UniProtKB/Swiss-Prot annotation:
Stored InterPro entries: LolA/LolB/LppX, OM_lipoprot_carrier_LolA-like, OM_lipoprot_carrier_LolA_Pbac
Family statement: Belongs to the LolA family.
Organism: Proteus mirabilis (strain HI4320)
Keywords: Chaperone, Periplasm, Protein transport, Signal, Transport
Lineage: Bacteria, Pseudomonadati, Pseudomonadota, Gammaproteobacteria, Enterobacterales
Quaternary organization: Monomer.
Signal peptide: 1-21
UniProt record, GO biological process: lipoprotein localization to outer membrane; lipoprotein transport
Record's GO cellular component terms: outer membrane-bounded periplasmic space
Annotated protein name in UniProt: Outer-membrane lipoprotein carrier protein
Coarse class of the protein's main subcellular location: periplasm
Length: 201
């Protein structure tokens, strides 16, 4: 009886691993169909009890694997740009720019996963699929508890959401998406005159 139970458990485990691998592969293949896109986004942040913390909006441009321009326009302005090597974060309200190496940037955020679409990074997650919706759970504990993303078969991202360990949820809905090459100037950044530059490279 014990041997039968162990066999059943092993089959269930291997079956789950195969399903995770298939879902992970399908997600990557879908994302690989679109290498360059731009879209508007709306952001909703809620607490673990469902209370609204913040609503925001902005515009993003992505050119995989490592180029992106994320501009938050409301409620406060901020800009996050990757030129492929350096990650620039500009907060005009405090007149400060922070520069870090992209390769050392945290990978446990939804946007970094989407922008890079690196197979090695996806291996750090168990992935379940329900139609066009993919649910990701980190294999090792970090500040990200759960991540979901909805991607159409043609590779267009419709929405993504991240749940942190404290239960806070950040949801992003993409609209007015355009799939087309993006001018390289969108991924270049020069700190404005007079701002403080915190260079952590």
């Amino acid at each position: 009886m014990k041997k039968v139970l162990l066999t059943v458990c092993a089959i269930a485990l291997f079956g789950s691993q195969a399903a995770w691998a298939d879902a992970r592969q399908d997600l990557q293949q879908r994302l690989n169909k679109v290498n360059s896109f731009q879209a508007n986004f709306s952001q909703t942040v809620t607490s673990n009890e469902g209370a609204l913390i913040q609503k925001g909006e902005g515009h993003l441009k992505v050119q995989r694997p490592d180029l992106f321009n994320w501009q938050m326009t409301a409620p406060d302005e901020s800009t996050l740009i990757s030129d492929g090597k350096t990650l620039w974060f500009y907060n005009p309200f405090v007149e400060q720019v922070t520069a870090t190496w992209l390769e050392s940037a945290t990978t446990n955020t939804p946007f970094m996963l989407i922008a890079r679409n690196d197979s090695k990074e996806w291996q750090n997650y168990d992935v379940k699929q329900n139609g066009d919706r993919f649910e990701l759970t980190p294999k090792t504990e970090n500040n990200l508890k759960h991540f979901s993303i909805t991607v159409s078969p043609n590779g267009q991202i419709q929405q993504f959401a991240a749940t942190e360990q404290d239960g806070q949820v950040s949801q992003y809905q993409l609209t007015a998406q355009k799939v087309a090459p993006i001018d390289a100037s969108a991924f270049r950044f020069t700190p404005p005159a007079g701002v403080t530059v915190d260079d952590q490279r």
